[in-house]
Design a protein with these regions (language model features):
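Flexible phosphate/Mg2+-sensing switch loops adjacent to catalytic phosphate-binding sites
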Residues: 331-369, 640, 644, 648-668, ...
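Extended, charged alpha-helical "arm/stalk" segments used for dimerization and assembly
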Residues: 363-447
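Pre-NBD coupling/linker segments of ABC/ABC-like ATPases
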Residues: 220-221, 243-290, 697-698, 703, ...
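Conserved ABC ATPase signature
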Residues: 304-308, 312-319, 380, 766-790, ...
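Phosphate-binding glycine-rich loops of NTP-binding sites
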Residues: 58-61, 306-340, 784-793, 838, ...
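Charged catalytic cores and adjacent phosphate/nucleic-acid-binding surfaces used
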Residues: 1-49, 53-55, 67-89, 94-115, ...
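Extended, charged coiled-coil "arm/hinge" scaffolds of SMC/Rad50-like chromosome-maintenance ATPases
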Residues: 444, 448, 452, 459-777, ...
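C-terminal lobe/lid and adjacent interdomain/linker elements of RecA-like ASCE P-loop ATPase modules
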Residues: 347-350, 370-374, 396-405, 816-918
Length: 918
């Protein structure tokens, strides 16, 4: 039969370590206990009261144990408690002779012989002396040191505690002299019961508890207990309560060995509050894991996990790292593979094996599903040390930035700057498109203008025709007055024709606008609705909150629709006026043609005149087209120049934003982490990518120095203070050079080159310094320690962290003085699952759970059924079982730690020697 019962290890449970039974002379309403059945009935009521109160352990400590061994109720209570999982520790309360009769408790192992306990009690009184006189409990004639010696010689496992230390007959009942101080400092008394939680103590007792009283300063575990004299809740009398009404939360197995842990960890293993301590959100802790394997290679039973510190130990190649990596891969395979790649370790080939992770809220992740629903930090073996290698520095920077972003104020400022940079990049992309659109339009206008002909040649031809027409007019005998009239009418006709064409264009444009605006308005209104819907979904608004948002947007839409209605009405009126204007301009042309006709009729050679008129009309139209294109070309060139300037401004803005990011990354408020550790950041330019992307556009058999003085030997000499100048100067060179002279590689165009030039090649590189020493110049051990401190101790992340052998390259002294301290602090807020070979990380960090792994290699028959098997429990789980069916089941966690971990036995011994409990 397996002795592994509490697989999840040390958990918080309620303990009442000072309880009495009706054998106590002060018991209220003593029930009948004469017969066996009456004792059993009371024991059942006693246990029911304890379990209803949520107790996991009670210590029955009746005064002087009992007057008659046969009347003892402890066996009956233990018998009733066992099926319900309630542990009953036997013990007694006795008044030792020190300081006028100080009460102490002695608590024994649940496996202790009650007969031997009774014999111990007998030795505390002179032979033949009674323990009671009527209802009076008699004090022992022995002092506390004599009590300790008698207990030591009994061979029993025991703990001595000061009973109700701050009350009458307690060790701290009154401020005393050297004798009371000496009594309080007895090294073999490691527990003191108080009437109230330590934080509520006042006066002298508070000075003792807080360690400010020099005469009473010592390490001791404090507990509170009921000191019950009844099973029924009522008015506490003399600081006594009903069973379970006052108790202590203790983080340990519900066993005597579990109780011993509060001696070693007096501050971290006890707690005084109503609800269970150290409760983490259930979606942030893993409840259990299991291999889904039908091949017989891995055990199929689930492995429960403690929500605090879980350590995985075992010999070489026993499946420790396999278990850890399977957890990581089932939760986030991509992250696990990326971390493993950095660490340069190999992932175990799982073949068809599946793996399941169940979270405390009931969620399940499976390796086969490859769906990321939860977060976890995975630090495989050597990952921390590989991070500082040159090739992995981007990953280090990413990790350090993630750490900084856990600060809410930093994150808000960071997001603001990133949004600004993104806005600049969006605007830059738009401006580049606008720039090339203008360039295309300019080329189109130039081409069309050239197709119409040469402007100077057309103007010369018009002058020649005008001279010929003038000769015809003179030959027709026009008077000076007719000549002047003729010229005026001709000039007016030219103006009227120009006005008519303008009126036609404006009217046509207005009709186009009127036809297309309604669709644009409807599209805009629809997009506004889309924005509202996206904002509602993104922020998870409730219906009432959504209505508030919509009420504001409705007003905007109504304003747009009202403005559109006014615009439609105004433009309708305007079109009527424009139509009238076009008709008037047409009539003016007709009028001037009519006025000109009499003069034209007088010219003798009408055929030649008509030819001149037709040529003049055609050439004037062509010239007007050329002038229009020239005007359009000038406008495009102005916009083109403005676009280039806008691009240059955006390049400058982008650089300024990056500078502000670097300033944020170096702000002491966020980067001074304590312990003289400082995170710093420098601006970086991705030179290799720039040369590959941008310079790769060109035929580099020719020098790229024409792009500027910073381009030498087909490479770039980058300096942060020159960044904007380098990019903008190269841009000017590109766009001013005829495209056929750029020597672009086949398939490349000017647009490609500009796009690649204007990409964002700016980045940042983080580093860490301690007392001015850069992490990249530290020893591997110091590098690992600092990064572990950042990622584990200083991080605000609450999701689980999985670490494989963090002790690599770190000496034992540093592990104990630093790494253990980090882990102890963080395990309270964050589940830590850690593979280790170092006993200090198991015992020093006070691991709540130890998982022992074993591989049955080469058919040795060490395992019960599978090639890879695991057992788990708390470090207080201690036993040997030579009849067990496997190596793992043959001993407890303590024994496995001593066997598997080098120095494990010494670590246990030092832990206990510290408290004189060896």
């Amino acid at each position: 039969m397996s002795d592994y019962i509490h697989h999840r290890g040390s958990e918080w449970r309620k303990w009442d370590l000072h309880a009495h039974t009706p054998l106590d002379t002060e018991w209220i309403s003593r029930p009948p206990l004469r017969t066996e059945s009456e004792r059993k009935l009371f024991a059942e009521q006693y246990v029911k009261t304890a379990t209803t109160a949520g107790l996991a352990v009670i210590a029955i400590t009746d005064h002087n144990f009992c007057s008659n061994r046969d009347e003892l109720l402890i066996p009956y209570v233990q018998q009733a408690a066992t099926p319900l999982g309630l542990t009953v520790l036997p013990g007694f309360e006795v008044a030792v002779s020190d300081c006028g009769g100080t009460h102490v408790l002695v608590i024994f192992s649940e496996l202790s012989s009650l007969d031997i306990i009774d014999e111990v009690m007998s030795q505390l009184f002179p032979p033949g002396t009674a323990r009671f006189q009527g209802k009076e409990v008699l004090p022992s004639a022995r002092g506390i040191e004599e009590l300790h010696e008698i207990l030591r010689q009994s061979g029993l496992s025991y703990l001595i505690a000061f009973a109700h230390a701050d009350r009458e007959n307690g060790a701290l009942d009154q401020r005393g002299g050297a004798l009371r101080s000496r009594l309080w400092k007895q090294p073999f008394v490691r527990i003191a019961q108080l009437s109230k939680p330590p934080s509520e103590c006042t006066g002298f007792v508070a000075s003792v508890v807080n360690g400010t009283s020099s005469h009473y300063s010592r390490d001791i575990a404090y507990v509170i207990a009921s000191d019950c004299r009844s099973l029924e809740p009522g008015t506490p009398a003399q600081e006594r309560y009903s069973l379970g009404e006052r108790c202590t939360w203790i983080k340990a197995d519900p066993t005597f060995e579990g109780l011993r842990q509060i001696v070693f960890e007096p501050n971290d293993r006890t707690c005084f509050q109503e609800h269970k301590p150290e409760e983490k959100p259930p979606f942030l802790t893993i409840d259990q894991v299991r291999f889904l394997d039908s091949s017989g290679k891995f055990q199929r039973d689930p492995i429960p996990l403690n929500p605090n510190l879980v350590t995985i130990i075992g010999g070489k190649s026993t499946g420790k790292s396999i278990l850890l990596s399977c957890i990581a891969r089932a939760i986030d395979a991509e992250q696990a593979e990326a971390a493993t790649e950095i660490a340069k370790t190999n992932l175990y080939d799982l073949g068809t094996l599946d793996f399941e992770v169940m979270w405390s809220n009931g969620d399940v992740d499976r390796l086969s599903e490859n769906e990321v629903r939860h977060r976890v930090t995975f630090l495989p073996q050597m990952y921390i040390h590989r991070l500082v290698e040159q090739e992995n520095r981007p990953s280090l920077s990413e990790s350090l930035l993630s750490f900084l972003r856990q600060n809410g104020t930093f994150e808000a400022r960071y997001r603001k700057l990133i949004n600004e940079r993104d806005a600049v990049m969006t605007e830059l992309a738009t401006e580049i498109s606008n720039f090339f659109s203008l360039l295309s339009s300019w080329r189109d206008v130039v081409t069309k203008s050239k197709e119409l002909g040469d402007k100077s040649s057309i103007e010369a031809e018009l002058n020649r025709i005008a001279e010929k027409s003038e000769e015809l007019r003179k030959a027709s005998g026009f008077t000076d007055e007719e000549t002047e009239q003729y010229r005026k009418i001709q000039q007016s006709l030219l103006s009227a024709n120009a006005g008519f064409r303008t009126a036609q264009r404006v009217e046509a444009s207005m009709r186009t606008v009127v036809a297309e605006v309604p669709a644009v308005i409807q599209d805009t209104l629809a997009k506004i609705d889309d924005v509202v819907a996206e904002a509602t979904d993104f922020h998870g608004l409730e219906e009432t909150e959504t209505q508030q948002l919509r009420s504001h947007v409705v007003k905007l839409k109504q304003a747009i629709e009202a403005a559109n209605a006014i615009f439609a009405e105004d433009t309708s009126k305007r079109i009527v006026k424009l139509t009238d204007g076009t008709k008037a301009a047409s009539k003016a042309v007709e009028a001037f043609n009519s006025a000109l006709k009499p003069f034209l009729d007088k010219i003798a050679n009408q055929k030649e005149l008509r030819e001149h008129q037709e040529s003049t009309k055609q050439l004037s139209s062509v010239l007007e087209g050329i002038n229009g294109y020239e005007k359009e070309k000038t406008q495009i060139e102005q916009k083109y120049g403005a676009s280039v300037e806008a691009v240059e401004r955006l390049v400058s803005d982008r650089f300024a934003t990056q500078e502000r990011l670097i300033e944020l990354f170096n702000e002491p408020t966020y980067t001074n982490l304590g312990d003289d550790i400082v995170i710093s950041a420098d601006m970086m330019f991705e030179k290799d990518r720039f040369e590959s992307d941008f310079l790769g556009c060109f035929d580099l058999r020719h020098s790229a120095s024409w792009l500027g003085s910073h381009f030498r030997d087909n490479s770039i000499a980058w300096h942060p203070e020159e960044h904007v100048k380098i990019i903008t100067s190269a841009l000017r060179k590109l766009i001013e050079m005829p495209e056929d002279k750029l020597r672009l590689r086949a398939g490349q165009k000017l647009r490609n080159a500009v796009d690649l030039l204007l990409r964002d090649y700016l980045s940042h590189s983080f580093s860490v310094k301690q007392t001015g020493e850069d992490i990249f110049r530290m020893s591997p051990g110091k590098q690992g320690l600092i990064l572990l401190e950042i990622f584990l101790h200083l991080s605000n992340s609450a999701y689980p962290v999985l670490i494989d052998q963090p002790e690599d390259n770190i000496d034992n002294r540093t592990i104990y003085s630093h790494l253990v301290r980090y882990i102890r602090r963080r395990k309270v807020d964050r589940q830590i699952i850690m593979v280790t070979h170092n006993p200090n990380l198991v015992l020093g960090a006070d691991a709540e759970q130890v998982i022992v792994a074993n591989q049955d290699g080469e058919g040795k028959g060490e395992n019960a059924e599978y090639r890879f098997e695991y057992v788990s429990g708390g470090i207080e789980c201690s036993f040997t079982n030579s009849q067990a069916g496997s190596l793992l089941q043959s001993k407890g966690i303590r024994e496995h730690v001593c066997h598997v971990l080098e120095g494990g036995e010494d670590a246990f011994r030092k832990r206990e020697e510290k408290y004189c409990l060896t």
